[in-house]
């Protein structure tokens, strides 16, 4: 059904297998910083018009790959498609971000929540299949979802938030309601990601964008536990091929040790984390060893080309030399930003970044020890 994969560097790095260079892709790589994306978005008329149209979603997913030699594509969609399918009424006002018409703020609203019919998300799965075919084996396709906790933040707040007052009020006043919501969210996310895998996704990523706003014990109880519930239900392989699972928690560096116990292959790190220390704690060998992904500050891309190259080298050097033994797994690194790329990023800066990653990481492997 799909063309053979020509560049499997990203997938091999996810599975802690030796690679010739460090693979690179960027969170939000298909996005507003690209003029061609803005043109397609204008034709679509709205963000949801873009995300729910298979042809448009395919077009914008491939746009960054036409410009840059990236090592993976990521589905163009939004993390809030799942609560939208639950009937919360998602909309995007220009310049304001996502908003739900019917937020979940009381016992009755929580009681009405249920895992949505995946048929309501058919447009996402059709896009996955269309993108996979259009890639024609060039690079792997990553599917994704928001984490149960991050979805709950939007579902309760009704939009983005500066202080998370409403969702944290529910968490502390009615933890029973929060647990009910998170359980439904976790089972919905698992079903959603499994359907993406069935449709052609070759890896899946859970974005816990707001895990870092939680207090220490609350993170383990209300975020990590439900991310683990999702991972426990995900397909490990499809058509005999392993499907790597990636988890990214923005602000989660302090919980790296706890996150290492997650049943996944890759941990994504934001720019506040020291890669060398992360490798020493969870990236070497052992029962919970993980591939690491990250973690350049996205604002580096506003610097000069020479400074971008310097900062890229610093991230690669911080992780250190990946292992070179193709006969066994070992420490591996996937280069990414520490969060999504800014819409204001000059497109030429991304070209500098990608070329710097490939060039410097090859030279690191060429050094004899």
Curated annotation (Swiss-Prot):
GO BP, sorted A to Z: protoporphyrinogen IX biosynthetic process from glutamate
Nucleotide-binding as UniProt keyword: no
Keywords: Cytoplasm, Decarboxylase, Lyase, Porphyrin biosynthesis
Pfam families: URO-D
Superkingdom of origin: Bacteria
EC number(s) reported in the record: 4.1.1.37
Name of the top EC class for this enzyme: lyase
Residues engaged in binding substrate: 28-32, 78, 154, 209, 339
GO MF, any single term: uroporphyrinogen decarboxylase activity
GO CC, one annotated term: cytosol
Keyword Chaperone in record: no
Ranges in a coiled coil: none
Subcellular location per the Swiss-Prot or TrEMBL entry: Cytoplasm
Residues marked Transition state stabilizer (site): 78
Subunit structure: Homodimer.
Function field: Catalyzes the decarboxylation of four acetate groups of uroporphyrinogen-III to yield coproporphyrinogen-III.
Family to which the UniProt record says this protein belongs: Belongs to the uroporphyrinogen decarboxylase family.
Designated name of the protein: Uroporphyrinogen decarboxylase
